[in-house]
């Protein structure tokens, strides 16, 4: 059964959280930062350090029922991934934010906004979001990227990220963090490439079907994002800046899902 009563009530309660979680802290989406070459050990450390920072800002909600629900879906997807039979140990976190978004940190740390749970119509749509983010991790989109920042100071990168998380409600703080000479060009680090997004879609749909979820769930959730694109016009919300949902992407996801048949 999708979204037990208590779980759904909890998600709506999180949506009603005060403005601190919605304005003062605005977690950047990190599904596929570019141009940073990392070893698996560095990936794990980076992800763990960022999660630690989020806990310090009370951005992660310790709701056992919802976290267990997301983890059950996520682990089911990971277990069905024949392409990556030895994935990292995924850790799933509920984020106190009413906006639709999810993000993947290196090392297998997946954040899921409360607003995404409320927006989803069924469990397959939630699975589509989780499968996409897991695929960013298993395909190692961070570590695969190459560039001049290969030898960059990871600790400094974490510091810049923490400053942006803490100061997202203050444009001056964000601009100050981005202007640091040691900031490793943060905007490029968190920018999604279309190639990575499409690859995460392809691998995500495959593991959805293998896990028994309706692979059309990913495309149907993209449709919700496309509707938001029309609603917001040029003032796109965070997830649409990082996860563009154009008609081509929706069509490709629909066509690929159809190859697996209904579930």
Language-model features: locations:
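Phosphoinositide system proteins, centered on phosphoinositide phosphatases
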Residues: 171-179
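Peri-catalytic and regulatory segments of divalent metal-dependent proteins
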Residues: 22-169, 186-192, 199-263
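Bacterial N-terminal signal peptides that target proteins for export
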Residues: 1-8
